Regions:
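Short, well-ordered secondary-structure "scaffold" segments embedded in the functional core
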Residues: 1-185
Length: 185
């Protein structure tokens, strides 16, 4: 059933929270020089593709980016290009890779950890806040780990890139199936 109003979302998912993160997967090095540069991730020091996931408190995948992005792109750029639309009262938990999201999306209830300023240590309350934030956000990391347990998503992707999104959709569906059926027991 498709939920059409904010009230319906609140009825079916009381206290709904969203946890958003991106993940990279290594691919074979492209032959084309231009594509080589586009897919090279400076963070991983490899050629990669990125996929963004949004999960709920139980770890169920609610949204996956429709198309993979080139590994060179930053997490926040991936979010700006293709982001899930959530009701205004839903809390969205991000990591520091999405720093600045409050300025670009003022209606979004974005919750980010406190960023350390140069040469200034975080206070104890800020450190405690960051610890609580990471404890809540770890669910998205666990879900990504479940996805990567499937060999096709955890190892280097050796298939054609035009099939990547179909494969990640299939694996996401299997992970959701396993999560949903383990919750009901």
């Amino acid at each position: 059933r498709r939920l059409r109003t904010v009230e319906e979302v609140e009825i079916y998912f009381p206290g709904f929270q969203a946890f958003i993160d991106s993940t990279e997967q290594e691919i074979q090095r492209p032959k084309n020089k231009k594509r080589k540069k586009e897919y090279y991730s400076g963070k991983k020091k490899r050629h990669t593709v990125k996929t963004q996931y949004m999960v709920n408190k139980e770890g169920t995948i609610l949204h996956k980016s429709n198309q993979h992005k080139k590994g060179r792109q930053h997490d926040y750029t991936v979010y700006k290009d293709e982001h899930p639309i959530t009701p205004p009262q839903v809390k969205n938990y991000f990591d520091l890779g999405y720093y600045g999201i409050e300025n670009d999306f003022p209606d979004l209830k974005a919750i980010l950890p406190v960023k350390k300023k140069r040469n200034i240590e975080l206070t104890k309350t800020e450190k405690r806040y960051n610890k609580r934030h990471s404890r809540q956000r770890v669910i998205v990391e666990h879900t990504i780990c479940r996805i990567k347990k499937f060999g096709i998503m955890g190892n280097r992707y050796r298939n054609r890139l035009k099939r990547y999104d179909v494969m990640s959709d299939i694996v996401s569906g299997l992970v959701n199936y396993k999560i949903i059926h383990s919750i009901r027991r």
